[in-house]
């Protein structure tokens, strides 16, 4: 039979270019924009090894920072990967989906890269709030040394308030993020310009030879220093992840003409300060201003780090939501904090887990220098994964020859690999923490995927083909009742469990029965014209398929209204939704190792109710329970 579809009249809102650029400055660059608080200081400390800071060290570190920002952030992300958008969206999972779409099938290799990159992003989303807020509050030690003991408690208090605030969303205060960060970056530039005059010869670091000379003359210390230099580019991957929110041009404009110059000027100002006043290396950032300006700068830095942390938290919510839609994780409870912005979501469980992880990091390391050792490994792993997946997109989707695609992307991957190796050297000093968080996340995804596949295989053995049931009901029709019954199922070729139970226990059949399947596309959003597909298979049965993008919130009743254009007189008040709820029990002989079996069952039990997740009115739902051993 012919398949039909209908379109919706909904249209995405449009925002002015400069408004998007301002918004991007407030959200996209928060993480990388707060790196001057600690990046240069930590790199110089590592390079000096406790000895006197020399001119070679300062110029070498500055040159490494400059060219890292040029190569990794500007060339790789801003100029190249921002063009690899998946229907306007960016980020690790979007790149994974784009690569799979490009090769025309699901790839275990690409899936693994996407999972690794996403898992490491979650690890990074715990470290960023901790190190950012802690480094800002540490300015109190300079303003008032007697307050040093209050740095950690104050940091904990700020973070608890920040995470507690998530339940109300950020829509009301987000408009202030842009102006605050404009002030922040402008302040960075002014501070840098003032101190470059202390020793203008610091500008010689623009010559990449100083980076090469430093590496050649410092051996293994140089490689360890690269791990600290990487702190200056952490957050670069966020430029790509936020592509869908602000667009390529606004992000490129904000970076190239405002954020990058401000960062470089500040770093060079810190370098000039250390060359003229070596004692300032203790905390180069806060030593750039006189004591009378310390408190206002601490307040501004704290505001900037809170905004940066907010962007990372929001990114974590978005990534987990995408992972759920792609079937990588169970359905977590999602609350919508804005009636006008679909992307404003709050995941209570994820928020609590992030808060616990962040507080553990603050209490474990207690200062930003300690956390700096843990920072970087997660981001560098994500960047390597992005680079390899980018090669697939350039080759398969853009149509480049493999050699040309490799020549373009693998120099960036090589640089990312060097940063990754350098960060591995900090494994025992703290880099194990984000790796542990990432490993735990990847394990959850792996077990959920494996358990779900095994559950499908097990239930398939007892399922009845839908066409066989329809033929049987036509020969021996049961009692027919008025109304419409919608049966949710993952496979429309087989009879939903709820339908079998309805026939077995109630011995009735509705006059209209809809076998409803909800699919997630490999695109962030689905064109409304392709949202609903309907197929009539008999007088009493029809199949309806709803397609949602992996960044969309599946709203079943709203989508079914579109079916009216296909001839189905859908009325929510005369429709009953039948949902099957599985109760999983461990089998005596499971196909999974014992620990995986119990973990999968625990994940399944923690999943949000399908009724709530698909936004179906609870008063119209009939839930049928079944017990399955796995």
Swiss-Prot record:
It catalyses: K(+)(in) + H(+)(in) = K(+)(out) + H(+)(out). It comes from the Bacteria. Keywords: Cell inner membrane, Cell membrane, Ion transport, Membrane, Potassium, Potassium transport, Symport, Transmembrane, Transmembrane helix, Transport. The chain crosses the membrane at residues 17-37, 56-76, 108-128, 145-165, 176-196, 214-234, 255-275, 293-313, 345-365, 375-395, 402-422, 427-447. It is found in: Cell inner membrane. GO terms for molecular function: potassium ion transmembrane transporter activity; symporter activity. It is a multi-pass membrane protein. Coiled coil: none annotated. The keyword Membrane applies. The keyword Membrane applies. GO terms for cellular component: plasma membrane. InterPro entries: K+_transporter, K_trans_C, K_trans_N, Kup. PANTHER family: LOW AFFINITY POTASSIUM TRANSPORT SYSTEM PROTEIN KUP, OSMOTIC STRESS POTASSIUM TRANSPORTER. Transport of potassium into the cell. Likely operates as a K(+):H(+) symporter. Belongs to the HAK/KUP transporter (TC 2.A.72) family. This is Probable potassium transport system protein Kup 2.
